[in-house]
Amino acid sequence: MADAAVAAGVQWFIPSEFGHDTTNPRVVEVLPPFYEKVKIIDHLRSREKDGLNWTSLHTGFFFDFGLTFDLLEFDLRQKTAVIWDDGNSRSSMSTFKTIAQAIIQIFADPTSREEAKNQYIRIATVTTTQNEILQALERVSGTKFQVTRIETAEGKRLGDQHLAPGDKDLAGFFLLLKYVALGKNEFLDWENRSGPHRLAIKAQQESVLDVVGRMYPKVTGEVERGEQ
């Protein structure tokens, strides 16, 4: 696709990176399919000489999407949660709105465009913990969630087991995504872990409570019942 973009005269390419930090070799080692993302960036770098610029966005987990489809280990309908370790590991996450704002800003603002030119860029709506999200969910729902726990090492073991040769079960892949995002290694803590430049998004961003309050009624069909 990058070669087709060059042939068509496209000047800027945003690859399908969105998500975990693929500049971290440990993350790519845990998630072997992400080697393909690394190879794509290597190819884009080889086409810079042909006038093709690129920006790769690291967003962390999709916050609103993760709440909708239980990727953050919260079942909003059943009022249950699976908390990794003590629930205090920090992870940066982005909503779809934040991702759209970042892309618009990169193309509309010359300073941001220069920051992002031929670079990996980090963005985030929030950097938070599972405990903070759980607190917001219980406040919005007015209901105490039933909590079970998993240790980081056990999540990694189960994920690797599912990814054994010949096993096509995506459950293992998603477990390893959660291991990277929610485990005690804090691979996705943009505020404290060194790595690519973080773009300061000019538009005001939502808080954890804002996102939870917006998504809870959409997912459950219930009205917000907790404290305001």
Model-derived segments and spans:
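Oxidoreductase cofactor-interface core, primarily capturing Rossmann-like NAD(P)-dependent enzymes
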Residues: 8, 19-146, 157-166, 171
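Short beta-strand segments at enzyme active-site cores
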Residues: 14-16
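Surface-exposed patches in mature extracellular/periplasmic domains of secreted proteins
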Residues: 147-148, 224
